[in-house]
Amino acid sequence: MIEKVDYEKVTGLVNSTESFGSVDGPGIRFVVFMQGCQMRCQYCHNPDTWAMKNDRATERTAGDVFKEALRFKDFWGDTGGITVSGGEATLQMDFLIALFSLAKEKGIHTTLDTCALTFRNTPKYLEKYEKLMAVTDLVLLDIKEINPDQHKIVTGHSNKTILACARYLSDIGKPVWIRHVLVPGLTDRDEDLIKLGEYVKTLKNVQRFEILPYHTMGEFKWRELGIPYPLEGVKPPTPDRVRNAKKLMHTETYEEYKKRINH
């Protein structure tokens, strides 16, 4: 266990930070993008976070990152705070525990954005994960695909651990926002959208269910890294397809929380 006095000294490999994030949790947020991710999502807009070694990544202490975040605290109001994303943030769990512990000591709202690929339902893993959850107010859980075969096509990995994490978070009552990226021809099949909606209904802790329309804003990063972009020529979903997905998955069921946040 990390001693409380050492939280500021715990280091992590950080790709970048964003001062005024507005889509990574409630309110205005300071967002930390961690380095490293095992998934290879075809639509990834941060492929520069995949490898643990990257020229942009910097080893930083939790104390240093927290001090940077505090510079923007006045903009957070009653709903904002700190979000840690990636990459996959849980690859560096000690850093997350340290940063979020510093935040909670100051009463700051904490959000974890995760794909949950690292999740393991084992005593050793859960011992540390429970410490993280103790200082995490909200989890943004990305469910890329409910269909296991399609999930492997989309990400290169099974969705078994993701669904196990979703069930665990439901069992402990941790507030969660479920997110699904809608990609034409890849993650927008009606039968799978219906199944995902049915699955989410079985979870007891979902405050919000978001459809994130696919965009091409990260395509240039693939070119910079010399990696062929697998979705070349694929356009964002039409408004009709987005409405269709929301209808099939009954996302409006979870809109009350959104209304409370915005008023």
Curated annotation (Swiss-Prot):
Keywords: 4Fe-4S, Cytoplasm, Iron, Iron-sulfur, Metal-binding, Oxidoreductase, S-adenosyl-L-methionine. Its main location: cytoplasm. It is found in: Cytoplasm. Residues 23-260 form the Radical SAM core domain. [4Fe-4S] cluster binds at C37, C41, C44. Gene3D superfamilies: Aldolase class I. Binds 1 [4Fe-4S] cluster. The cluster is coordinated with 3 cysteines and an exchangeable S-adenosyl-L-methionine. The keyword Metal-binding applies. InterPro entries: Aldolase_TIM, Organic_radical-activating, Organic_radical_activase, PFL1_activating, Pyruvate_for-lyase_activase, Radical_activat_CS, rSAM. One of its GO terms (molecular function) is [formate-C-acetyltransferase]-activating enzyme activity. S-adenosyl-L-methionine binds at Y43, C44, H45, G87, D142, I143, K144, H215. This is Pyruvate formate-lyase-activating enzyme. The gene is act.
